[in-house]
């Protein structure tokens, strides 16, 4: 009997250790330091501090439905009803969204860049890869429409987790924008985790994912199965441009292809030749901008 208890205790200890480790890695993924992001963007020529400081803008605070504040910056150099919201990727912050905002400023849009929960200056205790973030995005959309009018022309651009968040918002809550640009989204979080685990430790994800999911449900009150953009993409009617690098080895381009294939209505697809994950714009600037221009011309602007 004592041996049985020791065995059961060892199994329980193993499961608990795996569960805590996996859920911690997901909930508290190490974020990039803001100084690192600023210096990276400056050195690459994607951030000009002087030009940015000279923009007409204001810092805003928008309450999340989960009790923390979302920190955002509203940039309004133009007297226009055209706005775009930029949704950044995991471990990044709104500084990394400036390059995308500039792309739209050059096309006559005003913009909002903001920090996801637990990123940048926003509150929030953990990261949920789109599950809670989609409700925060709705708060940003609601605030903008309340302040600027429901008749605005609104676009949302998302990168990586930010793109997945955008799809979960548009397909799972409300199709609240006039157009969307999804840059390197994952189609299903469980499928992504399975791939990443196999790449990192050469073991099938089915060993670890159920344990991680059990602990996520207990600690963060969400389930991995609920983070599945592919389950919601067909509910989005507004036009969407899908972008992905062919050489992305973190979120495979096949995931974007699946999303594109299932999306109904107006849509376009652009596969960038150069760059790895979330580098399509950085490594293919002219082609990226042309893809955006072609999309806007065909589906958004007459």
Role assignments for model-derived ranges:
Residues 4-63:
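An N-terminal hydrophobic leader/cap segment in hydrolases
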């Amino acid at each position: 009997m004592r041996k049985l208890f020791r065995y059961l205790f060892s199994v329980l200890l193993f499961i608990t250790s795996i569960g805590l480790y996996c859920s911690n890695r997901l909930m508290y993924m190490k974020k990039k330091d803001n100084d690192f992001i600023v210096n990276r963007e400056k050195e690459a020529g994607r951030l000009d501090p002087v030009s940015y400081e000279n923009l007409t803008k204001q810092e805003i605070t928008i309450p999340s439905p989960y009790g923390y504040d979302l920190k955002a910056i509203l940039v309004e150099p133009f007297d226009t009803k055209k706005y775009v919201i930029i949704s950044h990727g995991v471990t990044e912050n709104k500084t990394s969204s400036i390059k995308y905002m500039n792309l739209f400023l050059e096309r006559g849009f005003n913009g909002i860049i903001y920090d996801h929960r637990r990123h940048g200056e926003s509150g929030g205790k953990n990261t949920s890869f789109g599950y809670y973030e989609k409700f925060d995005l709705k708060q940003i959309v609601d605030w903008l429409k309340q302040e600027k009018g429901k008749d605005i022309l609104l676009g949302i651009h998302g990168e990586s987790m930010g793109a997945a968040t955008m799809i979960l918002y548009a397909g799972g809550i409300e199709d609240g924008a006039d157009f969307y640009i999804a840059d390197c989204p994952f189609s299903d979080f469980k499928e992504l985790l399975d791939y990443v685990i196999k790449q990192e430790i050469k073991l099938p994800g089915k060993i670890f994912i159920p344990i991680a999911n059990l602990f996520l449900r207990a600690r963060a009150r969400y389930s991995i199965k609920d983070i599945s953009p592919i389950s919601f993409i067909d509910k989005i009617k507004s036009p969407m441009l899908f972008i992905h690098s062919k050489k992305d080895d973190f979120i495979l381009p096949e995931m974007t292809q699946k999303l594109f294939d299932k999306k109904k209505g107006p849509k376009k697809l652009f596969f960038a030749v150069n760059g790895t994950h979330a580098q399509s714009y950085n490594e293919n600037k002219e082609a990226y901008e042309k893809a955006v221009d072609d999309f806007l011309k065909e589906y958004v602007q007459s």
